[in-house]
Amino acid sequence: MVMENEEIRYVRRRKQMVENQIARRGINDPFVLGAMGTVPRHLFVSEALMDQAYGDFPLPIGEQQTISQPYIVAEMTQALEPTGNDRVLEIGTGSGYQAAILSRIVSRVYTVERIHSLYIRARALFDRLGYYNIATRYSDGTTGWKAESPFDRIIITAGAPDIPSVLVDQLAVGGRLVAPVGTESVQSLIKLVKEKTGVRSTDLGGCRFVKLIGEHGWKEN
């Protein structure tokens, strides 16, 4: 009974998160709202932080990394304009929460993580939750996943100095890429659309992410 009541409490908090933090701030894609209301965010943080999981703020996940605040996850997901047939590449698995959200909307998610402990933890959690349409890879995400390209959508979940051209090359024509781009401390959320004649970009506003480390990102200190 205690476990049942605890689960009901998390369901209620998840519903409040969607209504108060996400829908009220302009996220209106029903598939994004549905995914945010379904995926158990509290399982993607440590047990000590579970009670804070549905708050409107990022949380530490170890290795100097964070799980993004719910609104940012929803905003980036909606900006991708995901559809049910899409194959999506995620750069920076982290906690696995963003990939889990996408997996409830699209056909298949390919996610790359450079930190081994986070990669192992996320992969185990995907298996535990039955998210079998997520493929994981332990590698430098800034180089993408060429063998599985082209991708319909690409999402970068860490702040980059620029959008790596190698990732644009792995994006299908007509595809969307969303990434935080800027300095090490503050970025703008950029949406890129790849067309036959080139790329078109839109600035969606300011944001702040941990650094994108790798061959085509920031260098590790």
Swiss-Prot record:
Catalyzes the methyl esterification of L-isoaspartyl residues in peptides and proteins that result from spontaneous decomposition of normal L-aspartyl and L-asparaginyl residues. It plays a role in the repair and/or degradation of damaged proteins. The keyword Lipid metabolism does not apply. Its EC number is 2.1.1.77. This is Protein-L-isoaspartate O-methyltransferase. It comes from Desulfosudis oleivorans (strain DSM 6200 / JCM 39069 / Hxd3) (Desulfococcus oleovorans). GO terms for biological process: methylation; protein modification process; protein repair. It catalyses: [protein]-L-isoaspartate + S-adenosyl-L-methionine = [protein]-L-isoaspartate alpha-methyl ester + S-adenosyl-L-homocysteine. Belongs to the methyltransferase superfamily. L-isoaspartyl/D-aspartyl protein methyltransferase family. GO terms for cellular component: cytoplasm. Its main location: cytoplasm. The active site is at residue 68. It is found in: Cytoplasm. Keywords: Cytoplasm, Methyltransferase, S-adenosyl-L-methionine, Transferase. One of its GO terms (molecular function) is protein-L-isoaspartate (D-aspartate) O-methyltransferase activity. The gene is pcm. Gene3D superfamilies: Vaccinia Virus protein VP39.
